[in-house]
């Protein structure tokens, strides 16, 4: 009987963490249209993670690279030489990191 009482808090903890987790798109590489052509999956966030996507463009707006993931995320835009790297974050709804281009 004592074992069952100990398992109850563990089970409730696992249930709560799965309810609080957010599902996001995960893609190693997508093209300029948002089509994932390498590593298309769904990920589930861990504590402190949200949905994220990164887009790399040239200064004149030409698409170079993009990916999607579950990650600890800070929205930033950084210029690196002739490239602009934009990191985007969201947590409002599941799969909020869908890319529309």
From Swiss-Prot:
Disulfide links within the chain: 24-51, 27-36, 43-70, 73-89, 90-96
Transmembrane helix in keyword set: no
Signal peptide extent: 1-21
CDD domains named among the record's database cross-references: TFP_LU_ECD_UP
GO molecular function, one term: complement binding
UniProt keywords, alphabetically: Disulfide bond, Secreted, Signal
GO cellular component terms, A-Z: extracellular region; plasma membrane
Domain of life, per lineage: Eukaryota
Keyword Disulfide bond part of the UniProt annotation: yes
Any one Pfam family match given in the protein's UniProt record, by short name: UPAR_LY6
Location in or out of the cell: Secreted
UniProt cross-references to InterPro entries, sorted A to Z: LY6_UPA_recep-like
GO biological process, one term: negative regulation of activation of membrane attack complex
Domain UPAR/Ly6: 22-99
Stated name of the protein: Urinary protein 3
Species assigned in the record: Rattus norvegicus (Rat)
Organism placement in taxonomy: Eukaryota, Metazoa, Chordata, Craniata, Vertebrata
């Amino acid at each position: 009987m004592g074992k069952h009482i100990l398992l109850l808090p563990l089970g409730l903890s696992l249930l709560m963490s799965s309810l609080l987790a957010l599902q996001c798109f995960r893609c190693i590489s997508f093209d300029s249209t948002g089509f994932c052509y390498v590593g298309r999956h769904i990920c589930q966030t861990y504590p402190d993670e949200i949905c994220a996507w990164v887009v790399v463009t040239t200064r004149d707006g030409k698409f170079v690279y993009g990916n999607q993931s579950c990650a600890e995320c800070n929205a930033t835009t950084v210029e690196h030489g002739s490239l602009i790297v934009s990191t985007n974050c969201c947590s409002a709804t599941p799969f909020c990191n869908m890319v529309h281009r």
